[in-house]
Amino acid sequence: MWRLKIGAKGGDETHLFTTNNYTGRQTWEFDADACSPEELAEVDEARQNFSINRSRFKISADLLWRMQFLREKKFEQKIPRVEIGDAENITYKDAKTALRRGILYFKALQAEDGHWPAENSGCLFFEAPFVICLYITGHLEKILTLEHRKELLRYMYNHQNEDGGWGIHVEGQSAMFCTVINYICLRILGVEADLDDIKGSGCARARKWILDHGGATYTPLIGKAWLSILGVYDWSGCKPIPPEVWMLPTFSPFNGGTLWIYFRDIFMGVSYLYGKKFVATPTPLILQLREELYPQPYDKILWSQARNQCAKEDLYYPQSFLQEMFWKCVHILSENILNRWPCNKLIRQKALRTTMELLHYQDEASRYFTGGCVPKPFHMLACWVEDPDGDYFKKHLARVPDYIWIGEDGLKIQSFGSQLWDTAFSLQVMLAYQDVDDDDDEIRSTLIKGYSFLNKSQLTQNPPGDHRKMLKDIAKGGWTFSDQDQGWPVSDCTAESLECCLVFGSMPSELIGEKMDVERLYDAVNLLLYFQSKNGGITVWEAARGRTWLEWLSPVEFMEDTIVEHEYVECTGSAIVALARFLKEFPEHRREEVEKFIKNAVKYIESFQMPDGSWYGNWGVCFMYGTFFAVRGLVAAGKTYQNCEPIRKAVQFILETQNVEGGWGESYLSCPNKKYTLLEGNRTNVVNTGQALMVLIMGGQMERDPLPVHRAAKVLINSQLDNGDFPQEEIMGVFKMNVMVHYATYRNIFTLWALTYYTKALRVPLC
């Protein structure tokens, strides 16, 4: 029986270290004797239901840990479901009852350290690199036990498409990148190449898909790097990734410090392996894979021609003639000059040393999380190549369990955890509910624990040493996406957490306990002000430094805007909300700067509105998500339906897209297509519906014509399950426009948040 453990050390404690006693850490352990027959039957039923319905519902409901927590807390929903007939007849009591049912359920899912656990996954290129890395280093069976491997195979099979391939994400059409690396993953896990049946391996169908689409030479760059590392592709067939970039002066636009932090972290590990032309020691399996992945003999492949090949299914960001010429020039420089005597001795070796110095610094500063699950195995392998028995590699191994998540669909690798992000929003919901029912002491302990988690998770220092020289920006005052140990501050995580802390700070100490020191609130404000660009928008991880024209040269084929840091509407909206509240609570602290920030941020948001009244969402699906954060920011800045044309246009967009049921449902295709796209059959999604409902209420729709709001509320109330949960529907997160991410708690957060708005709106006429 798999169990989620919170805040546990576990594993190799010698090579595991923390900044705050592992607050927020999530790891899974298997104990065959830790369950009753009834519990095991419940888990098996959840697994079977997912497999049976996987063609219809492609993402998990994240049930295993939820069932565990509900059992441990002896949760029982005692409030009957509310069923709404006529939307116009919803009463305050109906709304509050549905809200209370959901709050009591959601409260039971809080961990003892104050955070809300959840999976943050869904990308199908997250798992295989870990398996490949552990296979090459000889640690596969040490890190991934038999039970781990069983669950990983379950996940692979559950998310294989009918045509035999795997998509970039669990709802996506088959793509070469994920089909190739997941095929390799199956083979490493012991699945025979020709074994194939509906319930079996799927290897033969995957191989057929690969060969029918031209073979593995059509894999995108990141996939080609992994194939080259494994020895089933040749480095000469890759676009160059020279380590010399880390030696360029700071005034160079190509200096590594100007890169987007996540791409920089990936590029750092890959460039070391590329610079050394590292190739794994051939094994019988590797030799077999060379024959299985290509329609032609391996020794007949023209690697120089394969360099720019990419399957049309993967090619989201087409490579222009300018790009091809640029990378051809870089290849000539890298291979014909820097990789030959005497430059290979004078420059390349120094570049490799510089790269590893930077890589070790980044790893130490993130407690060996690195930037996420994509750079992590590259960094881990680079450390092993440098010293197979060294502490750097062992420290990486110790953090692998932090990336593993177990759901009813199997074992998946997380981005790196969304503990802080989910918790900040969950606390927004709980605080809003407290405002609805301030006599309810049932959630007091929930609020206290949540506030404690935020307090313990804030970054209180900048990265160590000369962090600028080591390509790290400031961090003090920020909150991360996951936990404090990961160490990367994120602007909207900081804003949402600051907003919560400001609300907590306004509450009586006898209710909430010891309050956060005001200087730490100032630190958070300082960081948000620092993240604002000249155009008024807010970046995500670091201040914008890179030239945007560098995106024209991007070698990444399946994502967009990956080279330099950009500003985002959602981050900007969250920052306005937090700073507007801060201005009310602390009107004398950097007042002019905060007011200027809000003024410029409002202009930025207004300037990015689409002609139809919506805003494109960069981190969620998509126009509903972006519009919610944009309107929320504008309203916090004092804008209303009456005095703000963008809000009027946004409300009109929401009204025009409401379906006959009364809800909203947006397809993930809106993200890559950059055009509002309905779900098939114009069906409803409760997350989109919650976001849209809040936009309408913030836009004053209840005062003009409340019926659209009542209809939306009816959808949410009637969707609620017997235990107070809401149904898991389509995937709702996105990364760089084309990679979808699963946020399992969104179905609780945005529905309950919307019901707090609605319940308060119904209460107003009674006051």
UniProtKB/Swiss-Prot annotation:
Q: Which GO terms describe its cellular component?
A: lipid droplet
Repeat positions for PFTB: 149-190, 598-638, 647-688
Regions annotated as coiled coil = none
What molecular functions are annotated in GO for this chain?
lupeol synthase activity; oxidosqualene cyclase activity
State the UniProt keywords alphabetically. Answer: Isomerase, Repeat
Instruction: Show the catalytic activity.
Output: (S)-2,3-epoxysqualene = alpha-seco-amyrin; (S)-2,3-epoxysqualene = beta-seco-amyrin
Active-site positions on this chain: D492 (proton donor)
Among InterPro entries, the record links this protein to:
SQ_cyclase_C (IPR032696), SQ_cyclase_N (IPR032697), Squalene_cyclase (IPR018333), Terpene_synthase_CS (IPR002365), Terpenoid_cyclase/PrenylTrfase (IPR008930)
GO BP term (any one): triterpenoid biosynthetic process
Identify the domain of life.
Eukaryota
Keyword ATP-binding part of the UniProt annotation: no
The keyword Transcription is assigned to this record: no
Q: What Gene3D superfamilies does this protein map onto?
A: 1.50.10.20
Q: What EC number(s) is this enzyme filed under?
A: 5.4.99.52, 5.4.99.54
Family in the record: Belongs to the terpene cyclase/mutase family.
- Write out the function statement from the record: Multifunctional enzyme that converts oxidosqualene to lupeol, bauerenol, alpha-amyrin, taraxasterol, psi-taraxasterol, multiflorenol, alpha-seco-amyrin and beta-seco-amyrin.
Put simply, this protein is called Seco-amyrin synthase
